[in-house]
């Protein structure tokens, strides 16, 4: 059996990426003879983490069909996206012809390139959905209406996997319910050398938010809360851990402008996130809506 997986990003910070990593690890353990391949935007720690379990990979830059709120989306922009989608789907088709997979799986809903390429070649395709974009990503607009995107996902998929019963009930309203299944995920923390997860609490009250620096992940709201706490004369330490996708400079400026350098520490990303769980008294969920809040579950473990 040959399987190919498409990741929307190259870092390993998000819950969707770590679910994909767990899936690859589990498949290779249960079926060591299966060949697993990945397509992702470029090099990064996701590829490093997945390398022991895959037999090959391809870098391919693909545009999301979600764009910033400040972008106008008219007929010209839609036609431009369709042209680029066609171009890179054809490129991906060439790679699929070379590796000859039995099944393709797209991780998250942000682009349809693998699904289209699989359709062109008659390869079965599964969509692994970790979000409900019309309520999760309020900072983004779809290039096409969400009802069209959901219909495309339905038409281009033999199977649709979601991460919770809530997501299953939600998508059954807009897709073929027989195709949709929710899966139970085991959350496991790696052993980390030098970290005492049962250590005594620290002298400073410490909070942690893990997530990519994006406008919908809550970093700015947390910084505003920290500012108010400090203004009331209370001591607090806040860790913000995650890769930058464009929002980190705004957070850094806010920290400097409000004199919070002694209260906020930014960590661009670490593979040893357990270390920061052990440092925190409270871990915050990084968005107002989660289909499966993996970070919160990890922290509770």
Question: Where are the language model's segments positioned?
Answer:
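A short, histidine- and acid-enriched strand-loop-helix "catalytic/donor-clamping" loop
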Residues: 12, 65-68, 112, 123-142, ...
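A conserved mid-protein helix/loop that constitutes part of the nucleotide-sugar donor-binding site
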Residues: 14-25, 205, 212-231, 246, ...
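Conserved nucleotide-sugar phosphate-binding/catalytic loop shared by glycosyltransferases and other
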Residues: 37-77
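Glycosyltransferase donor-sugar binding loop
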Residues: 38-45, 187, 210, 237-250
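An aromatic- and histidine-rich active-site surface loop
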Residues: 46, 85, 89, 103-123
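Nucleotide-sugar donor phosphate/pyrophosphate-binding loop at the beta->alpha transition
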Residues: 87-88, 124, 133-156
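Carbohydrate-associated surface elements
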Residues: 166, 186
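Aromatic "clamp/platform" in nucleotide-sugar-dependent glycosyltransferases that forms part
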Residues: 269, 288
């Amino acid at each position: 059996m040959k399987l190919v997986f498409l990741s929307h990003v190259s870092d390993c910070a998000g819950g969707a990426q770590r679910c994909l990593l767990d899936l690859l690890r589990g498949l290779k353990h249960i079926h060591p003879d299966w060949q697993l391949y990945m397509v992702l935007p470029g090099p990064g720690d996701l590829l490093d983490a997945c390398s022991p379990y895959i037999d090959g990979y391809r870098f391919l830059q693909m545009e999301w069909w979600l764009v910033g709120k400040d972008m106008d989306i008219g007929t010209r922009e839609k036609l431009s996206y369709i042209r680029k989608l066609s171009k890179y789907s054809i490129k991906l088709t060439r790679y699929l012809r070379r590796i000859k997979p039995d099944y393709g799986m797209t991780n998250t809903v942000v682009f349809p390139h693998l699904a289209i390429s699989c359709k062109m070649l008659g390869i079965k395709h599964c969509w692994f959905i970790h979000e409900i974009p019309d309520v999760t990503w309020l900072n983004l607009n779809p290039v096409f209406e969400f009802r069209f995107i959901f219909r495309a996902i339905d038409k281009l998929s033999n199977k649709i996997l979601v991460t919770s019963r809530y997501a299953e009930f939600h998508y059954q309203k807009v897709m073929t319910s027989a195709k949709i299944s929710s899966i139970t995920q085991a959350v496991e923390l790696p052993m980390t050398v030098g970290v005492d997860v049962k250590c005594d609490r620290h002298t400073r009250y410490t909070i942690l938010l893990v997530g990519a620096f994006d406008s919908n992940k809550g970093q700015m709201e947390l910084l505003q809360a920290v500012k108010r706490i400090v203004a009331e004369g209370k001591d607090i330490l806040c860790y913000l851990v995650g890769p930058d996708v464009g929002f980190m400079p705004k957070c850094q400026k806010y920290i400097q402008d409000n004199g919070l350098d002694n209260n906020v520490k930014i960590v661009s990303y670490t593979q040893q996130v357990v270390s920061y769980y052990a440092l925190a008294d409270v871990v915050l969920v990084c968005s107002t809506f989660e289909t499966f809040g993996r970070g919160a579950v990890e922290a509770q473990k």
